[in-house]
Swiss-Prot record:
Residue ranges crossing the lipid bilayer per the database entry: 35-55, 99-119, 126-146, 154-174, 182-202, 216-236, 329-349, 365-385, 388-408, 419-439, 451-471, 483-503
InterPro entries: MFS, MFS_trans_sf, SLC43A_AATransporter
Primary location recorded for the protein, binned into one broad class: membrane
Regions of compositional bias (Basic and acidic residues) in chain numbering: 289-302
Molecular-function GO term, any one: L-arginine transmembrane transporter activity
Subcellular localization: Cell membrane
Origin species: Toxoplasma gondii (strain ATCC 50611 / Me49)
Glycosylation site residues: N246
The protein, known as: Arginine transporter 1
Annotated GO biological process: L-arginine import across plasma membrane
Length: 534
């Protein structure tokens, strides 16, 4: 029984991030434990980030507060719906309110690139404070918007602008959890998804308490963005935590240098970081004491042949080389992930817009329930990525997207509709997280912010094409028939397979070349040390 318990504990412990690794021992604000800091960042992401994505409740609040009610006069009033049928007063008000989502999303993805650039240049604390300033301004302007002070447009400009700007700095905490970056990314991604519930909570409070719309908005501005700005001031560092790749060479080199099989080809593995501070902790110790017994001499020989982490950190041959942004961005791998992320955006957005045309009422209701629960498979995918890597999971998700639309083609069957909902539920669970993890594990950490920002900008803006596919093509040209667009998207998903397989091959080759470079430098260092000892 004790052996079984010990075995179970060992397996659970193996799933935990490495605590002995130098990267896990980096300094945190006020020396806060890294797990406590993670919980703080999770609450931070939950309270703010992309709250406007809870659009159903958000738009209901806008209608009820009378936003754009001033346009329902004259001819526009003639298009008013029957009383009690809808939330809006006239069709023009509905159009104006719905346009706010597109405005916010365009600002959101445009500012993603700006946020990424600032994250790499100015630092995480300044970026977080800027983002929360945008968020606070958005809700304050919304609180006072009305016929005499029409500030609803700038409110949603700031709301979109602050979404990624405020939350990007929290992603850098993954550098404190070497070997578990995907799980930590997925955890933060789940919290960002849960922030979509904020408008629902605010709407429920407003309707149940009877307080004014102004009080709801100001109250959230204080309890959300302003509180998170205080958290950012104290708990988000000025300088980003050092990336895993800053130390991967010296840590992996230590394993190779001190391994009896160092002469054999090393396996390509994802290497964790090592601490630059180790460079001041000493060099190789060579004993000059000749008054030793034979066993002592043999032990001393073994010790002097070992190469320590501090030696490797000191050695200039293991210092991380600086690379330019263009050398990372203008590559097949980066082009591939941007293209894949864009296709994911089309698949996800069109399904959500057109679901009412190919799902029965019960299946559509199931979709509404499952969508917020997509945080659950998000965490599971994070564990799987840590085990098998990001590319197999991306290929798996592309297959899940394919199955989603295959079931849509067969939507005459109610069973196929429910399978479609289940597949889509899994597909959207790790929508942005998969891109973050791929960039973090493939490219130089010095450009992490810029790379995810540009990818979000490209994928986000091009995902707006789904509005054309649904509004102009499906509704306008095809009279509501979704099949032609669904088949076209199926073809696009299938065409992604050769690109993704080529990306996997290219990425594996890149990792192998990095390992071979480390191996050659280790052997060079060992030879130099042997010559010095002789």
């Amino acid at each position: 029984m004790a052996g079984l318990l010990s075995s179970c504990c060992g397996r659970v412990y193996a799933l935990l991030p490495d605590s002995a690794h130098p990267s896990a021992q980096q300094k945190t604000p006020f020396g806060v434990n890294r797990y406590v800091l993670l919980v703080i960042y999770m609450i931070y992401a939950l309270l703010t980030s992309s709250v406007y994505f809870g659009w159903r409740s958000m738009s209901a609040m806008l209608f009820k507060s009378g936003q754009f009610s001033w346009v329902c006069t004259g001819e526009s009033a003639d298009t008013s719906p029957e009383e009690g049928e809808t939330d809006y007063l006239c069709a023009l008000q509905d159009t104006k309110v719905q346009s706010l989502f597109t405005i916010a999303m365009a600002c959101h993805f445009t500012c993603s690139a700006v946020a990424g650039y600032l994250l790499d240049t100015v630092g995480p604390k300044a970026v977080a404070l800027l983002g929360q300033t945008f968020n606070a301004l958005a809700w304050i302007l919304l609180a006072f918007s009305g016929p005499n002070f029409r500030s609803v447009y700038p409110a949603f400009v700031f709301m979109g602008a602050g979404a990624d700007v405020s939350v990007y700095p929290t992603l850098l905490i993954v550098n404190l959890f070497p070997g578990s970056t995907a799980l930590i990314m997925a955890t933060l991604g789940a919290c960002i998804s849960l922030s979509f519930f904020v408008p629902l909570v605010l709407r429920t409070m407003w309707e149940s308490t009877g307080i004014s719309f102004e009080a709801v908005c100001i109250g959230y501005a204080v309890a959300g963005p302003i509180l998170c700005a205080v958290v950012a001031f104290f708990f988000i560092p000025f300088k980003a935590f050092k990336g895993v790749d800053n130390f991967s060479a010296c840590v992996e080199a230590e394993k190779l240098a001190n391994s009896p099989t160092a002469q054999s080809s090393p396996k390509a593995v994802d290497s964790p970081p090592c601490d630059e501070g180790a460079s001041s902790r000493g060099r190789l110790a060579v004993s000059h004491n000749t008054e030793r017994t034979a066993p002592d001499d043999e032990q001393e020989k073994d010790n002097t042949e070992r190469i320590s982490l501090s030696d490797l950190a000191c050695d200039p041959r293991f210092k991380k080389q600086k690379v330019s942004f263009s050398s990372q961005a203008f590559t097949f791998l980066y082009f591939g992930i941007c293209l894949y992320f864009t296709v994911c955006g089309w698949v996800m957005a069109y399904y959500q817009e057109a679901a009412g045309r190919f799902l029965c009422n019960d299946a559509e209701y199931t979709l509404e329930i499952l969508t917020p629960l997509s945080t659950i498979p998000c965490l599971l995918f994070g564990v799987v990525i840590n085990r098998i890597g990001i590319m197999p999971v991306i290929l798996m998700l592309n297959t899940i997207g394919l199955l989603t639309y295959v079931c849509v083609v067969a939507a005459e069957s109610v069973v196929a509709q429910y399978f479609s909902v289940i597949f889509f539920f899994m597909y959207i669970s790790i929508f942005t997280t998969q891109m973050y993890v791929f960039v973090e594990s493939t490219f130089d950490s010095a450009h992490f912010g810029k790379l995810i920002g540009v990818a979000s900008l490209i994928g986000g803006l091009l995902s707006l094409i789904s509005n054309v596919l649904y509004g102009d093509v499906t509704v306008g040209m095809l009279n509501g028939d979704t099949r032609p667009v669904v088949i076209a998207l199926l073809a696009v998903i299938i065409l992604m397979y050769p690109i993704l397989l080529a990306m996997r091959t290219k990425r594996n080759r890149k990792k192998q070349m990095e390992q071979e470079d480390i191996r050659s430098r280790v052997l060079e260092l060992k030879a130099a040390h042997a010559a010095d000892a002789a």
